[in-house]
Each structure stands twice: as structure tokens, then as C-alpha cells.
Amino acid sequence: DRLIQGHSLEGERCFVVGEKPRSGLIHEQPESRPKTACNYDYIASIWPQLDWYLEGGDFYVGVQTKRGCPHNCCYCVYTVVEGKQVRLNPVDEVVKEMRQLYDRGVRGFWFTDAQFIPARRYIEDAKELLRAIKAEGLTGIRWAAYIRADNLDPELAQLMVETGMSYFEIGITSGSQELVRKMRMGYNLRTVLESCRMLADAGFRDHVSVNYSFNVIDERPETIRQTVAYHRELEAIFGADPVS
């Protein structure tokens, strides 16, 4: 509200990228230290309610496979919270954490990364992780993640389906390529549709959550119509019911 009204942010607990840090605020660069698996036996020892929390099973438990996001989307804080450098968590540690949860009855996993596949150069890393999940014998699981759907190839799409991806979120934001460019999102909307077709061809038939942000920079009736038309394209690929 203060920005919209043209007021200063001097008294707020935030900073503006590019400006010199103000006295009294803590500015810390993200560490690149490898993240080891959570020790759920220890967590259970200090939190007796853990097993009660995990009962039921109709939910996802978060597991992080990487930190950071290399992109420059104008509205997103992930580059401030986690940094722009992508730090991959060791595959064996990710699988070890999933195994602990699996043995406690968990079958739903949410990969809490800012982006599960942040750029095309991380496609092979995603494949390595999914192959390791298969090799570990974590059968009957379902997993979900926030993905940039422009970073797929047919083999990765097949692995995602085979290992139990049951839900994914994509931040389309707008069906107007003009507005996507102005928000510095760095992807081509046609490429996203091609990747979605790869997932459908691989057998994905589950839920797709599409994030839109109306009234963004230079939004107008024409661009809203483009967004509605784009959503219809996604429905044509996955079906109307799974896409929301």
C-alpha cells in the first residue's frame, strides 16, 4: 500500500534491491552448505505428536531437493529469501529423508523447491533424483511440485509420471506473452504448452493448478482475453476438470 501511495519504505522492515542496506537490518547471503536429510527419529523424540500429525495420509509432507531460483520475475521474493544461486541437495540425502517418511506411512510428498526444475541445465539433475526414487523402491507414492513447465523433455516427463507425480503448479501469471516479458519471467508460452503436451503424452491425468495474476503491468481487456484463451488451451491438453 505504501508503494502504491508513493510513501517511503524507510520505516519498514524491508529493503529495495539495488539500494544500500540500511542500518539496523540484517542482510545475510544464503549459504551453499549441502543440506542433509532431516532426522525424523530425533524429531519424534522431541515432538511426541509427530506420528499423530502424520496419521491419515491424505496430505503432502514437504521435502526440499534444492534451494534458490535463478530467475528475475518482478513480483517474486524467492531470490531474496533463498538467493539466485541454485544449490542442489545431495540426491542420497533427499531419498534418505523420503525413506524415513515412507517408513512412517507417508505416501504424499511436496517438493518445496522454489522451482523443481529451475532451468534446462537442471533437467538431468531432476532425472537423477527421480531414478533414485524408483531405485529406492518407494512405490505407491504421489508427489507434487511447483515447476517451470518450459524445462522438460520427453524422458523427464515420463519419469515424473512413473514416479507418481499427481499434482503440479505452474505460474503462468498471464496468457499474454507481452505481459510475461514485462514481468521478466523469461519463458515462452508456446514452449510451456509443448511441455504440457509431453506430460499428457507420458500419461499424466491428474490435477494441474495454474497460477494467474490479473491486473498486472499493462493489463487490459485484450490481455485478459488472451489469458482466458490460454487457459482453454491447457484444458484441451489435460481436460477441463483437472485444470484449475
Role assignments for model-derived ranges:
Residues 1-97:
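Acidic, low-complexity intrinsically disordered segments
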Residues 1-11, 159-167, 228-244:
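Structural recognition of alpha->loop->beta junctions
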Residues 7, 80, 113, 172, ...:
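Residues that line or immediately flank small-molecule/substrate-binding pockets and catalytic motifs
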Residues 9-11, 71, 119-121, 178-183, ...:
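Flexible glycine/acidic-rich beta-alpha junction loops that bind and position SAM and/or redox cofactors
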Residues 66, 84-87, 146, 185, ...:
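Hydrophobic alpha-helical scaffolding
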Residues 91-209, 214-217:
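Conserved SAM/AdoMet-binding glycine-rich loop
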Residues 156, 218-233:
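Catalytic cores of alpha/beta
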